[in-house]
Regions:
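Short pre-active-site segment immediately N-terminal to the catalytic Zn-binding motif
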Residues: 48, 97-113, 146
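Short, conserved phosphate-binding/catalytic loop or strand-edge motifs used
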Residues: 94, 131-139
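Short alpha-helical functional segments enriched in proximate histidine and acidic residues
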Residues: 60, 121-122, 158, 162
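Metalloprotease/metallohydrolase-associated module, dominated by Zn2+-dependent proteases
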Residues: 141-165
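Hydrophobic (often cysteine-bearing) scaffold residues that line and stabilize catalytic clefts
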Residues: 53, 112, 151
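Catalytic Zn2+-binding segment of zinc metalloproteases
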Residues: 109, 118-134
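Hydrophobic or amphipathic, alpha-helical segments that drive membrane association/targeting
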Residues: 1-87
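Divalent metal-coordination and catalytic microenvironments
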Residues: 57, 98, 117, 155
Length: 165
């Protein structure tokens, strides 16, 4: 993963904002239940079921020069275009969930950006970062929001790598 580390935004580090992530360990219970619910209404993406999406997934991992260690799912959602990466999994692999609306709306390149972005959340272990909604201290809440923005910049950089020529 060293190859992708050079693209990580310099502020994508909890210490930059005085945040001790050990204090927040396993705080993402709400997120985990949401992901579990999504997965219960999802199907695994395979080359037989969604060949174009499967091809985009393969291109992303070729461009990022990393092994595909993920489970990919599509969940039925005709209203919301969204994607998520989960560290909790039905197997030993992390899960990336794409909504059917997202797949419907995006071109192959745009989908590759989103997949790369979600892969980066896993690579950079952003699920370990605290959720600002669980913080009462206003200054710490603002710092967590700033950390979240920095994390999104890191993931967008990988997204651009994933969809670039």
């Amino acid at each position: 993963m060293d190859y992708l580390d050079k693209y990580k935004f310099s502020c994508d580090n909890p210490e930059e904002f005085g945040i001790d992530i050990k204090k927040y360990k396993k705080q993402n219970v709400l997120d985990e239940s949401h992901i579990s619910d999504l997965l219960s209404h999802s199907i695994r993406i395979t080359k037989d079921i969604l060949p174009k999406v499967s091809k985009s997934i393969n291109r992303v991992f070729e461009k990022l020069e990393i092994e595909n260690q993920f489970n990919f799912f599509v969940t039925a959602d005709s209203f919301q275009a969204n994607a998520a990466c989960s560290l909790i999994s039905l197997s030993s692999k992390p899960d990336i969930i794409l909504t059917s609306k997202l797949i419907e709306l995006l071109s192959a390149k745009e989908l590759e950006f989103v997949i790369g972005h979600e892969v980066a959340h896993y690579v950079y272990q952003h699920a370990m970062y605290p959720n600002y909604q669980n913080e009462e201290n206003r200054n710490l809440k603002l710092n967590i929001l700033n950390l979240s923005r920095a994390a999104e910049i890191s993931c967008d950089r990988i997204g651009f790598l994933a969809c670039g020529d």
